[in-house]
C-alpha cells in the first residue's frame, strides 16, 4: 500500500480511498487527468519512485535503519503488547522485519543505494550520494 499511498498523496486526495477503490480507480483517474495511458504497474512504479526518493532525502538528513523503531513495549520482553487471544503478549521481531522490508525495497540497512535510484530512473546528480559504498542486495 505504500506505493499506492504515495500516488494518492501526489493526487492530493484522501488516501483512505485506496482501501475502497484500489489501484484500478487510480489508473482511471490519472489517465483521465493527464490524457496519458499508464498501466497499474507503471503507476505503482511511480509510487515506488516517490517513496524511495522520500527515503533518500531522509538518508541525506542523516536517518537510516537505526532510526526505524517502535516503542519499547512492542520489542522488549518485559512489556509485551497487551492483547487478546493469539496476539496477547506477543513481541515484534523488528530487526528481522526491517531487514525483510529493506530487501523488498532494495535498500541496505535503511539506506537507498545509488543502484536503486538508477534502477528507478532517478538521477540525483554527482556528489549527493549517501550510500557510503552500500550496494543493492543481489536478486535471488
For the regions a language model picked out, list residue spans one by one.
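Extended C-terminal regions of large enzymes
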Residues: 1-140
Amino acid at each position: 500500500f505504500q506505493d499506492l499511498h504515495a500516488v494518492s498523496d501526489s493526487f492530493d486526495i484522501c488516501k483512505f480511498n485506496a482501501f475502497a477503490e484500489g489501484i484500478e480507480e487510480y489508473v482511471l483517474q490519472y489517465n483521465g487527468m493527464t490524457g496519458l495511458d499508464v498501466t497499474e504497474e507503471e503507476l505503482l512504479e511511480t509510487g515506488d519512485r516517490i517513496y524511495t526518493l522520500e527515503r533518500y532525502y531522509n538518508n541525506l538528513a542523516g536517518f537510516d535503519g537505526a532510526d526505524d523503531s517502535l516503542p519499547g513495549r512492542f520489542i522488549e520482553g518485559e512489556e509485551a503488547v497487551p492483547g487478546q487471544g493469539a496476539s496477547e503478549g506477543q513481541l515484534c521481531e523488528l530487526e528481522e522485519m526491517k531487514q525483510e522490508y529493506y530487501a523488498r525495497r532494495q535498500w541496505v540497512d535503511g539506506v537507498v543505494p545509488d543502484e536503486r535510484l538508477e534502477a528507478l530512473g532517478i538521477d540525483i546528480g554527482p556528489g549527493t550520494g549517501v550510500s557510503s559504498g552500500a550496494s543493492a542486495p543481489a536478486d535471488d
